[in-house]
From Swiss-Prot:
Species name: Afipia carboxidovorans (strain ATCC 49405 / DSM 1227 / KCTC 32145 / OM5)
Family: Belongs to the universal ribosomal protein uL5 family.
NCBIfam families linked to this entry: PRK00010.1
PANTHER family reported in the protein's UniProt record: 60S RIBOSOMAL PROTEIN L11-RELATED (PTHR11994)
Known partners and oligomeric status: Part of the 50S ribosomal subunit; part of the 5S rRNA/L5/L18/L25 subcomplex. Contacts the 5S rRNA and the P site tRNA. Forms a bridge to the 30S subunit in the 70S ribosome.
Gene label: rplE
Protein's UniProt name: Large ribosomal subunit protein uL5
Length: 185
């Protein structure tokens, strides 16, 4: 009895609709030229970690709930006296999502988290890096439903970078628009 593997909803949409639409739109001949999502990197910098090391552990725990996998604690590369920062001190956490977890996270980001952001007017369409990757920042991590604000107690910001295989920003924008990223007009 063969079990069918779980395929995330957005992956099915990409395979069924988006891939053929992008192939037609950009006149691509090779299947491997079609832009696709590569990975999502979520970074959470904890500025208060200079005074209290427990804050990084709390942030890493919340990031694990959001991402669905254990984050890596990031450390400072050099000492900065004005910030009372020593070399090698824990200052944040990051996680890299690929494949199924990446599609699940993007689905939750677009359909659940972004609509819960206060005064949300759409994503900035100029936040592409020139190589087909898109970055956005959230001021509060509590917009994700996995986080209970009463238990978390604090609110940290996070940087989210969506890496694609697109060669240009135009292709990446078309790919993310097809995934229903709410870009500002």
């Amino acid at each position: 009895m063969a079990e069918t593997a779980y395929i995330p909803r957005l992956r099915e949409v990409y395979d069924r609709d988006i891939r053929s639409k992008l192939t037609e739109q950009f006149g691509l001949t090779n299947v491997m030229q079609v832009p696709r999502l590569d990975k999502v990197v979520i970074n959470m910098g904890v500025g208060e970690a200079v005074n209290d090391r427990k804050k990084v552990e709390l942030a890493a725990g919340d990031l694990a709930l959001i991402a669905g996998q254990k984050p890596i604690v990031t450390h400072s590369r050099k000492a900065i006296a004005t910030f009372k920062l020593r070399e090698g001190q824990a200052i944040g956490a990051k996680v890299t999502l690929r494949k199924a977890k990446m599609y699940e996270f993007i689905d939750r980001l677009i359909n659940v988290a972004l609509p819960r952001v206060r005064d949300f007017r759409g994503l900035n369409p100029k936040s592409f890096d020139g190589r087909g990757n898109y970055s956005l920042g959230l001021k509060e991590h509590i917009v994700f439903p996995e986080i209970d604000y009463d238990k978390s107690g604090e609110s940290w910001g996070m940087d989210i970078t969506v890496c694609t295989t697109a060669a240009t920003d135009e292709q990446a924008r078309a790919l993310l628009t097809a995934f229903n990223f709410p870009f500002r007009q």
